[in-house]
Structures are given as structure tokens and as C-alpha cells.
Amino acid sequence: NNNTDLPWHICSIIDDTSDVNLLNTRVLGELERGASSFELPSFSKNPKRVLNKVDLSIAPIYLRNLKCNENEIKDFVNFLLEWRKINKKDPCAGIDVDPIATDIWNNYFSNSNNNSKDRLKDLISLKENSQNNLINVNFFHFDGSLWNDLGASLIDEISLLASSLIELLRIYKNNNKLKVSFCYSLGTDFFSNIAKVRASRLVLTNLMNHFEVDLDITHIGRTSSSLFYKESPWINQLRVTNAGLSGAIAGVDRLVCHPLTSKLGQAPEFVRRLTRNTHIILQEESHIGKIQDPSGGSFYLEKLTEDIAREAWKRIKEIEENKGITNLIQNKKFLNHLEKNRNNEIDKISSGQIKRVGVNTYQDPNPREIKVKPYE
């Protein structure tokens, strides 16, 4: 991931626009002002103009379009191959589209018709066809934030990520030194966020030992969609900072913080700056990244980490005893379980049983409006 000088990659989300020159300006603006990597929501426009003057060998690009089809991913890979040929350097990049969770997420939250039962096999085929030329590109990404959106509990999130990896290892045998990334949702529970990432490391290490493989794993923290409310955009920033700090302490390799206006529309420049500066302050003023394991030795967190890892391991065994994750995601009982969890949390927030500052408690009597442009 070319992340040799930073504790974690500061990854900026680039708001999409039909104006390719503006899109290029946004990418360059983020990189020039503190971001070290960036995430594009689509790859259907003119990529040469969008990425003009961007050195992908030092600034990784990640494609995260949950509605993309196989052709868009192929176009992305072909562009990276062409970029390598022209620039004589290896691009750093990732396809941040979970081959298992994405389709389920789309069924609930979008009207996309690009679902594919063979998404994992398609990625394996792309990987095999280009692996010698794209050594710094990650083709396999498993996204706990999608499962979190769907209603997965903390234990569910870890076990579903681990079971997704098992499915990959079951299908793809040429997997030594394989690059795989795991994304974790960072919510309002500070200590649980830290313990979740640490517990997942234990679980994944056990799986690698079991399968006798040596994977190149990237751990990613992403602010959960449950942090953001239209009613309290300014308070959203407090929740983002809390979640970002927990991800930093957990030792993620890349941190993605959504702007405080993410539920309203495109982030204005001052909001994008605030989001970048959240990372920069954590890195350069708190110096958390200079400590190998900031939470190591804390009895509470060590015990919580172990308890979560043990429960997740039990759940993984249950999933595998029932023919793995591909069988699980077709089980209506499991899907109903996720939906019930999601609805329960919404009901508890509506009733005030779960407190959200600025939403159902301590509302701002004179909220300051933030003017935003709608998403394109």
C-alpha cells in the first residue's frame, strides 16, 4: 500500500461529478492538502483526464462503486495496466467492492440491477490475468461496513468477514502472499471499535495458520453510516472524530472518514478540510501512530478483544458447519435476523432508548445550516 511514512493512509472520498475537470481538481486538491490516498465512487468517465497529474505509485486509488458491473471493474484494471506501461511504475490501487456483501446491500438500499452471483470468480479471473503486472493492486476486499448497514452485530461482522475469506481460499488455491483487505465499521462505541479490529486480527491469524497461507492483509476503518444524521451535522463531526480515534488506536492501515454532511449532499470545501484535518491532528499532534499497539496492556481491552474473538470463532464454526457463507446469505432466517437488528436500532433511537446527541437529546435550539450541493 506504499504506506511507509504514515501511521495509516488518509483516504479521502471524492464526490462524483459529471465534470471530469472538476473531478480531477477535487482529486488533486485532496492529495495536495493532506490526503495520501483517495476513493472514487465510479470509473465510467474519462480516467486519463480525471487522474491527470496523479502519481498512482505513491497515491493509491480505490474504486468503491457498489453499483458497478463487471465491465467497469475491467475498465479500471485495464486503465491500471495502461498507466503502468506508460509511466514505467507500479500503480497502487484496490477494488473496494465486496464480492459477497455488495449484492445483498444493493437488494436493500439501492435499485441497482448489476448484481452478480459470479462476482468472486470474476475477480479471481481478473487477478490471474494480470497478477504479474499489477503487484500493488488488491483485488479482494471484504467490507464489514456493508454488513453493519444491513444490521450485523459486532460478532456477526467479524464472522462474516472471516467466512468470506474462507470462501475465497476455498475457491482460489494460488493464494500465497495474496493481497486481501478487510474493512470494519467504526461506530459510536469507542472501546468496541478498538476491540473489534484487534479481535479480527486474532481470528484472521488463526485462519491463515489453519489454511497454511501467508496473506498480505490490509485493515481498513470506515466511519459507520449510523454516525450521521441530517438533524445534527455539526455533532456528526464529534462522532467522526471519536470513531476515527478508535480506528487509529486499533492500528488500521487505512482510515476512511465520511464528511459530516454525508447525509445532506456533497461536502463543501471547508467540510472536506475539516475531515482531512481530523486525520492530520490525530497523526501529527496525538502521535498515536508512533506506538505499535496503543491499547496493548489495557486489561479491559485485552479481555474484551479475547471475548469477542472467541465468540466470533464459535460463529464462524457454525457458518462453516452449514456449508459456508454462500449458503448462509441465501437463508431467509439469516436475512430476517439482520433486518430485525436494523429495525430494532432504528426503533430504539426513535423512542429515545438509544441516545444520540443532537438527534433525540440535547438538540441544538439554533442549528446553523450548512449549504451543500445535492449528489449527482
Task: Tell where the protein language model's regions lie, with residue ranges.
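Extended, hydrophobic alpha-helical segments in both membrane/secreted and soluble proteins
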Residues: 200-203, 207, 241, 277-278
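Short glycine/threonine-rich loop-to-helix capping motif typified by GTGT followed
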Residues: 152-158, 188-199, 225-238, 265-275, ...
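Catalytic-core signal marking the mid-to-C-terminal active-site face
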Residues: 273-376
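Conserved, mostly hydrophobic/aromatic
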Residues: 34, 85, 204, 250, ...
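Catalytic alpha/beta active-site cores
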Residues: 1-190, 211, 216-220, 254, ...
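Catalytic alpha/beta core domains of metabolic enzymes, predominantly
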Residues: 181-188, 192, 196, 214-227, ...
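Mobile "lid/hinge" segments at catalytic clefts and subdomain interfaces of large enzymes
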Residues: 136-167, 245-315
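Non-catalytic terminal/interface segments that mediate subunit docking, oligomerization
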Residues: 1-23, 27, 31, 239-243, ...
